Regions:
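Helix-loop-helix
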Residues: 1-218
Length: 218
C-alpha cells in the first residue's frame, strides 16, 4: 500500500512539475506526461510489438491452411485442436501471445495511477475549448474515437473482409467510454492512441522492409 501511495505521489508531482513549473498547463501537462511514460516503456513495447507484428504476418500467411484444417477437422474439436497445435508448432507459434498481455500489464499501473490522481482532484482547470477537465466533453470524446480508429487502421494485417468493422467498433466503444470519463483522462487516452498508432505504423513498415530485403523470412 505504501508503494502504491509512493507511485501516486510520483505521478502527481511529475504532473505538477509539467503543468505548473514548466508552465504547460494541466492539458499539455497530461499530454507530455503520457508521451514521457510511453517513451519510458518503449524498449519493452517495441520489442513485444515487433514480435507481435511478425506473428500477425505469419498468421495472415497461414489463413489458407487454417481454413483447410477447419474444413477437414472442424467436426472433431479434439482432433482439430491437435492439428492446430501441430501447425503452430511447425511455424514456431503459440496458441496464445503472452507477450502482448505483458505489454498491457506494464501500462496498467500508469493508467490506474493517473486515474486515481485525476479522481483526487488533479484535473482541475481548462484546456483549449474544454472549460472543466473534471467533466466529460463530447468533442474530446470524438477525438478519442478518431485516434482509436487511426490506431486500428495502422495495422495492415487486419482481415480485409472485417477491416472496417475492426476499425469502427473499437472507435465507437472508445467514444462511449470517453463520455463517461473526465476530460483529463480522455486526453491521456487520445495521446496514448497517437503514440501507439505511430509505433504500430513504424513497426509494420520496418518488418515489411526487412522481409522485402530478405533480412527477415516469415
Amino acid at each position: 500500500m505504501e508503494l502504491w501511495a509512493f507511485w501516486i505521489d510520483g505521478i502527481r508531482s511529475l504532473l505538477h512539475f509539467l503543468a505548473s513549473d514548466l508552465g504547460l498547463g494541466i492539458g499539455l501537462g497530461i499530454f507530455a506526461l503520457t508521451l514521457a511514460t510511453r517513451s519510458a516503456l518503449l524498449p519493452l513495447t517495441w520489442s513485444i510489438g515487433y514480435r507481435g507484428c511478425i506473428r500477425q504476418k505469419k498468421m495472415t500467411r497461414l489463413q489458407p491452411q487454417l481454413k483447410r484444417l477447419k474444413d477437414e477437422f472442424g467436426r472433431d474439436p479434439k482432433l482439430y485442436a491437435e492439428q492446430l497445435q501441430q501447425l503452430y508448432a511447425q511455424q514456431g507459434l503459440s496458441l496464445l501471445d503472452a507477450r502482448g498481455l505483458l505489454a498491457l500489464i506494464a501500462q496498467t499501473p500508469i493508467l490506474l495511477g493517473m486515474y486515481q490522481v485525476f479522481r483526487d482532484g488533479a484535473n482541475a482547470g481548462r484546456f483549449l475549448w474544454i472549460r472543466d477537465l473534471a467533466k466529460p466533453d463530447l468533442a474530446l470524446a470524438l477525438i478519442v474515437g478518431l485516434t482509436t480508429a487511426l490506431l486500428m487502421a495502422a495495422n495492415p494485417d487486419l482481415p480485409q473482409q472485417m477491416r472496417l468493422l475492426l476499425i469502427a467498433l473499437p472507435a465507437i466503444v472508445a467514444v462511449i467510454t470517453a463520455l463517461k470519463l473526465c476530460s483529463a483522462l480522455a486526453i491521456y487516452f487520445a495521446a496514448s492512441n497517437c503514440f501507439s498508432a505511430a509505433q504500430t505504423y513504424c513497426l509494420h513498415a520496418l518488418v515489411a522492409r526487412r522481409v522485402k530485403s530478405g533480412a527477415l523470412v516469415i
